[in-house]
A protein has these predicted regions:
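Polar/charged alpha-helical tracts
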Residues: 6-14, 116, 140-143, 192, ...
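Alpha-helical oligomerization segments
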Residues: 191-237
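Hydrophobic transmembrane helix bundles of membrane-integrated enzymes that assemble
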Residues: 33-40, 183-191, 205-209
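Charge-rich cytosolic interhelical loops and cytosolic tails of multi-pass membrane proteins
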Residues: 80-158
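N-terminal first transmembrane alpha-helix
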Residues: 1-109, 200-203, 219
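Charged, low-complexity, helix-prone segments enriched in Lys/Glu/Asp/Gln
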Residues: 74, 102-103, 110-111, 158-178, ...
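Membrane-proximal, non-transmembrane alpha-helical segments
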Residues: 126-196
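Short, flexible coil/linker elements and helix-boundary hinge sites characteristic
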Residues: 23, 43-47, 121-125, 129, ...
Length: 237
């Protein structure tokens, strides 16, 4: 089994942090700043006032506080809403679903090879005949085995890349979801105080909702590709 050195692990951690966490937050925070700026101008219609507001928004203390809060909320949203309530609610996570009897991603022979290898390594004790989504012990066995598989496949560069891609899509969804909530709140406020400018946010919301659907699909595909690569690398090592 190939092992990553401490230095390699640290390098990968920095790359993942930058690509899967920082970049999505920077993109969606920039969008939220634009959304707030449009709202300020719609309310006050004063470009000088808008410039003063923007100067406050880009101050270091505000950015630090906003980034911390925005990041925490977005990550929670991406985990609780995107993973648990949308893309993997009915189908389970790809790494689990792929080994179920009714899933056709892998052939029966390939599934048996994976299970047999897990048995040989002492990570599996259940009968393969109970490979279905209604069998909780089987699902738990897959989840436990996945931890072992992740450990022995950690060295693979392509697997790491796909993990970064999935993390990027997942966190981008979380940040954009928060932006969409901000847009909804602003539209309601403008609707109460203006007869015209709230309509701007209808178009913004349409674009955001379409983007959310596309990103959710992208995250789902990245998750499936990651799971396929995970088991392929496991069989090869």
């Amino acid at each position: 089994m190939q092992q990553l050195t401490i230095e390699q692990q640290n390098i990968r951690a920095k790359i993942y942090q930058k690509f899967a966490h920082n970049y999505p937050m920077m993109i969606t925070m920039a969008l939220s700043t634009i959304i707030l700026a449009i709202a300020e101008y719609a309310i006050w219609q004063d470009i000088n006032f808008l410039l003063r507001v923007l100067s406050c928004l880009i101050s270091s203390s505000f950015l630090t506080a906003f980034y911390f809060l925005f990041t925490r909320i977005s990550r929670r949203v991406s985990k609780d809403i995107l993973e648990n309530m949308i893309i993997f609610k009915s189908t389970r996570k790809p790494s689990t679903r792929i080994l179920l009897k009714d899933d056709e991603t892998f052939s029966k022979i390939k599934k048996h090879r994976i299970i047999s290898k897990l048995k040989n390594e002492g990570c599996w004790e259940l009968d393969m005949k109970i490979m279905n989504s209604n069998n909780k012990p089987y699902i738990n066995a897959i989840n436990n085995a996945t931890s072992h598989i992740l450990e022995v496949t950690r060295h693979d560069g392509i697997l790491f890349e796909r993990n970064c891609n999935y993390g990027f899509a997942r966190n981008l969804f979380g940040g954009l979801f928060v932006d969409t909530l901000i847009s909804v709140v602003i539209m309601i406020v403008l609707l109460c105080i203006s007869n015209v400018y709230w309509q701007w946010y209808i178009y913004i919301l349409i674009v955001e909702i379409i983007a959310l659907l596309l990103i959710a699909f992208m995250a789902y595909r990245e998750g499936v590709d990651y799971a396929i690569r995970l088991y392929d690398v496991y069989l090869e090592y």
